[in-house]
Amino acid sequence: MQPALQPTLYESLEALPEGVTGEILNGQLHTHPRPSGAYVNVGSMLGAELICPFRKGNGGPGGWWVIDEPEIHFVRNVEVAVPDLAGWRRERMPYFPEDQRFEVVPDWICEILSPSTAGRDREIKMPLYAYYEVRYIWLIDPAKRTLEAYRLEAGTCIETGRFADADRVTAPPFGAVSLDLEIFWPPQRPVWASMPLS
C-alpha cells in the first residue's frame, strides 16, 4: 500500500476555510483571519482615492491597475503573497491573468498593519518584496494613524516619507496627486460607547 501523499503547500493554501487568508512566504504557510472593520475601511478608502486618478485618469495620469488583495505568485504556487493592495503600470501588465494567480511583479504594494500581521509584514514580506523587486511599498498603521512610504534602491527599501493623522500624502509612485490621510481613519469610538449598560 502506498503512503498517502502530503498535500503541497499550495494545496494546503487552497484548502483553507473561507474567511482565512493564506500566503506562502519563504517556504512556510502563513494564515490570518479576515481583518477588523477599521482595517478594511483603510484599504477601501485608499483604493477609492487611487482608482479615479490612476486607473481611470480622472484628475490624474491614469495608466495603472490598483487591486485589492491579489494573489501574487512571485514563483508559481511556491512563493505566494496576498498584499492588501497592489498596483501595476498597465504597460507592464496590460491584461489580467485568466485565473487568480498574478505572476507579474507589482510596481507598488500596500500593507495595512494589524496587531496580528505587523511583524510578518515588516520582517518577512518587506524583504521578500525587495528581493522580487517591488519598486514601491507603503505601510499603513490604522492604530497609529500613520503611512510610511518606501522606494527600492539597490535591493534595499529606503523610506521616502512618513505621514500621520491629517497630513497630505504626496509619495511615489502616486505623487501626481495629494491624498488626504485623515479620511482613511475611522471615527474614534467615544468612551461611553464601550461602557457596559447598567
Predicted regions and their residues:
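Gly/Pro/Ser/Thr-rich low-complexity, intrinsically disordered segments predominantly at protein N-termini
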Residues: 1-198
